[in-house]
């Protein structure tokens, strides 16, 4: 018996049945409990959502900037009023610790929505003089109907990161959450409607990426796709979006990011930074700094600091606010992470901490994997080359600055990078040479609403957050005005 009622699609301002009886289960990864059955959208449901979005978008775009801003601000207020309720649901659905979802997921998502709500009246064009009798002006106009496809690790936050700039710019969005974690996005749709968003401006279609995601990316009347997920899937989404109708895309994809500890770093700060870069959210963060480079002569001391901190991690029931490390998001993902851990052992990396599934007591019911640290790693190991998306840190040693920069950049990914040093000259010199879109100096992980987020190389295309994301949900129309005589050559 599921804990919650059947979860339906959200189209045209309310819940509606899908076109078929097919459903999938939402599972609590902490104990295997079925939380709810969730309907699978059909291709006909996608078309229904597009028609609804087209109708709603015209109403939304015709509102004044201040009217749109006020509605989005009201949604922010409701999100904050229901923070704990939404955080509790997010914890059940994802397995993330409530101590995290309560203070981060909804809070930072609401911050992004508030940021863009404030920018709505600032969307403006330019006036360009040509001569005394003529000038050009530009308009930033909404794209129309856009699609958002979310990942499972930050469900409601990602839905807000994508919908906030899209709605602020006057678009309608059809959002497909991950099949693994669909519940809070449906609640977000309710909140938008309650805040006054016209029907159809934010529709939610649940189902698989192979089906619903593909139908969205191929739809000829959807103007843009914003996707968060793995690189392999992102390539397919981008190919489908461009081949169907030359859609614009934003791709926030995978990473295998380097964290460089320099020899002048405070080792306690370095260890704290490495812990946050690897074990926050049970290691399921795309920007994690899983390749930790340490000077050879500091390796033993750094390992001791890390082992001490790993021993302090409070693993347990994610609903307990004292817990700061919960299960992985699903049992299939747990098996994937355990496979990488086995590969690390097989290829000769030494296990400093963890390295196994947790099965004692209540842990046996859930997808719990011990925080794992490998040392004596080399650049050619699978655990160093491939994104694991779990609580697995790889410690590597180096000798010179030039060497570590070269090795840090020796990857197909380029999402994030960071370093720890007391020398700010070195910090900026090195950061400017690292091939990554998001970088931190003496810290890791913070992504403010004003900070553009995105990757280099195979870690993505375009940016989320910041003013650039708002602009990317608009298109520019140029208009020339002639006040003088017009002479034809014919």
From Swiss-Prot:
Q: What is its EC number?
A: 1.2.1.8
Q: Which domain of life is it from?
A: Bacteria
Cofactor(s) named in the record: K(+)
Q: In which pathway does it act?
A: Amine and polyamine biosynthesis; betaine biosynthesis via choline pathway; betaine from betaine aldehyde: step 1/1
Which amino acid positions bind K(+) 1, per UniProt? 27, 93, 180
Annotated site (Seems to be a necessary countercharge to the potassium cations): 248
InterPro entries named among the record's database cross-references:
Ald_DH/histidinol_DH, Ald_DH_C, Ald_DH_CS_CYS, Ald_DH_CS_GLU, Ald_DH_N, Aldehyde_DH_dom, BADH
UniProt cofactor note: Binds 2 potassium ions per subunit.
Q: Name one GO biological process term.
A: glycine betaine biosynthetic process from choline
Q: Which Pfam families match?
A: Aldedh
Q: Does the keyword Oxidoreductase apply?
A: yes
Which amino acid positions bind NAD(+), per UniProt? 150-152, 176-179, 230-233, 254, 286, 387
The GO terms describing molecular function are:
betaine-aldehyde dehydrogenase (NAD+) activity; metal ion binding
Modification type Cysteine sulfenic acid (-SOH): residues:
286
Question: What PROSITE patterns does the record point to?
Answer: ALDEHYDE_DEHYDR_CYS, ALDEHYDE_DEHYDR_GLU
PANTHER family, per database record: ALDEHYDE DEHYDROGENASE-RELATED
Q: Entry's HAMAP family? A: BADH
NCBIfam families on file: BADH, PRK13252.1
State the oligomer form and interacting partners.
Dimer of dimers.
Q: Which family does it belong to?
A: Belongs to the aldehyde dehydrogenase family.
The name on file for this protein is Betaine aldehyde dehydrogenase
Q: Which organism does this record belong to?
A: Pseudomonas fluorescens (strain ATCC BAA-477 / NRRL B-23932 / Pf-5)
């Amino acid at each position: 018996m599921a804990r919650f009622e059947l979860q339906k699609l959200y189209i045209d301002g309310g819940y509606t049945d899908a076109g078929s009886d097919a459903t999938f289960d939402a599972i609590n990864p902490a104990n295997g409990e079925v939380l709810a059955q969730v309907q699978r959208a059909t291709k006909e449901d996608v078309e229904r959502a597009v028609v609804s979005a087209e109708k709603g978008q015209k109403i939304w775009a015709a509102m004044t900037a201040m009217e749109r801003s006020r509605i989005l601000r009201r949604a922010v207020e409701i999100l904050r009023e229901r923070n704990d309720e939404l955080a509790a649901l997010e914890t059940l659905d994802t397995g993330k610790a409530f101590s995290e979802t309560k203070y981060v997921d909804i809070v930072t998502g609401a911050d992004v929505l508030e940021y863009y709500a404030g920018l709505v009246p600032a969307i403006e064009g330019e006036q360009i003089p040509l001569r005394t009798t003529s000038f050009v002006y530009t308009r930033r106009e909404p794209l129309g109907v856009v699609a958002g496809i979310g990942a499972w690790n930050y469900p409601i936050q990602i839905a807000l990161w994508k919908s906030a700039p899209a709605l602020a710019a006057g678009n309608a969005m059809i959002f497909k959450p991950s099949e693994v974690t669909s519940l809070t996005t449906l609640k977000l749709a309710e909140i938008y409607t309650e805040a006054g968003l016209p029907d159809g401006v934010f529709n939610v279609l649940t189902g698989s990426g192979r089906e619903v995601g593909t139908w969205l990316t191929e739809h000829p009347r959807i103007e843009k796709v914003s996707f968060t997920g793995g690189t392999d899937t992102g390539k397919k989404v981008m190919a489908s979006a461009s081949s169907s109708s030359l859609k614009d895309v934003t791709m926030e994809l995978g990473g295998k990011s380097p964290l460089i500890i320099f020899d002048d770093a405070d080792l306690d700060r370095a260890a704290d930074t490495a812990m946050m870069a690897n074990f926050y959210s049970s290691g399921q963060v795309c920007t994690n700094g899983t390749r930790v480079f340490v000077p050879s002569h500091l390796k033993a001391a750094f390992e001791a600091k890390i082992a001490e901190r790993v021993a302090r991690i409070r693993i347990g029931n994610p609903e307990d606010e004292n817990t700061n490390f919960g299960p992985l998001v699903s049992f299939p993902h747990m098996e994937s992470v355990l496979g990488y851990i086995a590969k690390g052992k097989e290829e000769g990396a030494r296990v400093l901490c963890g390295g196994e599934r947790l099965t004692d007591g209540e842990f046996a019911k859930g997808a719990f994997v011990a925080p794992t640290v490998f040392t004596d790693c080399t650049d050619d190991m699978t655990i160093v080359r491939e994104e694991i998306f779990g609580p697995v840190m790889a410690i590597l040693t180096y000798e010179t600055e030039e060497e570590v920069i070269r090795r840090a950049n020796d990857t197909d990914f380029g999402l994030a990078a960071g370093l720890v040093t007391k020398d700010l000259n070195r910090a900026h010199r090195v950061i400017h040479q690292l091939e990554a879109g998001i970088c931190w100096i003496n810290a890791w992980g913070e992504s403010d609403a004003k900070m553009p987020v995105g990757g280099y190389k195979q870690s993505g295309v375009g940016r989320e957050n910041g003013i650039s994301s708002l602009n990317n949900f608009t298109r520019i129309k140029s208009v020339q005005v002639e006040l003088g005589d017009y002479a034809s050559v014919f």
